[in-house]
């Protein structure tokens, strides 16, 4: 039997540079990654450094609501 809510939840990470700059003129789109986080260990919003194929560099990807 499961004990209460699951600790691991899926989260979406979105490129903050693409959102701020309104996406590059050459390509349209916003980089998004799907990952998991442990709700008990990281109650705050998750931010990771990931590669953005639209910016062509590593940028900060922040957690967004579904």
UniProtKB/Swiss-Prot annotation:
Q: Which UniProt keywords apply?
A: Chloroplast, Plastid, Ribonucleoprotein, Ribosomal protein
Which GO terms of type biological process are on file? translation
Its annotated compartments are: Plastid, Chloroplast
PROSITE patterns in the cross-refs: RIBOSOMAL_L33
Checking InterPro entries in the record gives: Ribosomal_bL33, Ribosomal_bL33_CS, Ribosomal_bL33_sf, Ribosomal_zn-bd
Q: What's any one GO cellular component for it?
A: ribosome
Q: Which GO terms describe its molecular function?
A: structural constituent of ribosome
Predominant location of this chain?
Answer: plastid
Q: Which family, according to UniProt? A: Belongs to the bacterial ribosomal protein bL33 family.
Report the NCBIfam families cross-referenced here: PRK00504.1 (NF001764), PRK00595.1 (NF001860), rpmG_bact (TIGR01023)
Please state what the protein is called. Answer: Large ribosomal subunit protein bL33c
Specify the species.
Answer: Helianthus annuus
């Amino acid at each position: 039997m499961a004990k209460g809510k699951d600790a691991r939840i899926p989260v979406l990470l979105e490129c903050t540079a693409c959102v701020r700059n309104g996406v590059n003129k050459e390509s349209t789109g916003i980089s998004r990654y799907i990952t998991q986080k442990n709700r008990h260990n990281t109650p705050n919003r998750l931010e990771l450094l990931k590669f953005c194929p639209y910016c062509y560099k590593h940028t900060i990807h922040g957690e967004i609501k579904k």
